[in-house]
Each structure stands twice: as structure tokens, then as C-alpha cells.
Design a protein with these regions (language model features):
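Asparagine-centered polar/low-complexity signal
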Residues: 95, 110-113
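Short, hydrophobic/aromatic-rich beta-strand segments within well-structured domains
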Residues: 12-16, 105-107, 118
Length: 156
């Protein structure tokens, strides 16, 4: 496994990869020897463009290779359908994947999304309009939603 790190407005981002991207996550510090391969630079540049408000979608999604159950992968695929600047609820996602009673399981799968920003789990909020959980905290989630045009008062 190779790793690349870069600093961003939301913190240090780590990309784990081999031939494909395995994980994109926020970390507290850079640890170990970092690589600088083409695949890393491809995603690093897209993420930085997004964080600067210059990109609304991502290219080369076929290079994402998540490890997870079929159920988790179906949830992550559904997340990719949530448009930039829009939100969805856990209930709507459960309906989208044909499992309307599986809201909690959907929430768990959303929380295990291995691809920060690229697979937009930050766009999922509670049905009542509350922000809901986020693996990297509500401040990061709010910041990502602000980039997409949400105002603080539009999210509870």
C-alpha cells in the first residue's frame, strides 16, 4: 500500500492507494514515507479544486476501489447520486437503495464511507434538517456544505 499526504483548508488529507484508490481520509499528522504518484496527484488536485470552490464533480471515479460489504457499496453508490449543493436524508438514501426500513444501517454505512469528499457523505443530513453525524466532526461537515452554498441557518 502506498500513501500520499497533503495539507488542505480542512486539515491533512491522506490518500491510500495501490493501482486504485483505497481510502481518502483526514488524519492528525503525516506519518511514514509519502509517495507522489500520478494517481495521487490526480485526486489531490481535484480535492483542492473542490475545497477552493472551483470543482463540483470528480473525474476518474472508476479508480476508487473500496473495501466493504455489498450493502455498504450500494449506499456509497447512492451517495454519488446526491448532486452538488443538495442534501439527502438517511431515509431518502434507504429508499434509493430499495431498503426503506434500513435507515440505521444506511447511517452506519455512510459513516464508514472510505472516500472523504469524493463520495459525498457530508451531503447526508437528518430528515428533520439537523446536521447529523460525520466521521470528522460537525465543523468539517458544515465547512464542506458551505463550500457547496449552504448557509449556517439552512442546516440546523
Amino acid at each position: 500500500m502506498k500513501y500520499g499526504y497533503f495539507k488542505s483548508p480542512i486539515g491533512i488529507i491522506k490518500i491510500s492507494y495501490e493501482e486504485n484508490i483505497k481510502k481518502i481520509e483526514l488524519v492528525d499528522e503525516i506519518s511514514g514515507k509519502a509517495s507522489n504518484d500520478k494517481i495521487l496527484l490526480l485526486f489531490k488536485n481535484q480535492i483542492l479544486e473542490y475545497l477552493a470552490g472551483e470543482r463540483k464533480s470528480f473525474d476518474h471515479l472508476e479508480l476508487l476501489n473500496p473495501e466493504g460489504t455489498d450493502f455498504q457499496k450500494s449506499v456509497w453508490q447512492a451517495l454519488l447520486k446526491i448532486p452538488y449543493g443538495k442534501t439527502s436524508s438517511y431515509k431518502e438514501l434507504a429508499n434509493e437503495i430499495g431498503k426503506p426500513k434500513a435507515m440505521r444501517a444506511v447511517g452506519t454505512a455512510v459513516g464508514k464511507n472510505p472516500f472523504l469528499i469524493i463520495v459525498p457523505c457530508h451531503r447526508v443530513i437528518k430528515s428533520d434538517g439537523n446536521l447529523g453525524g460525520f466521521a470528522y466532526g460537525s465543523k468539517v461537515k458544515r465547512n464542506l456544505l458551505k463550500i457547496e452554498g449552504f448557509k449556517n441557518q439552512s442546516i440546523k
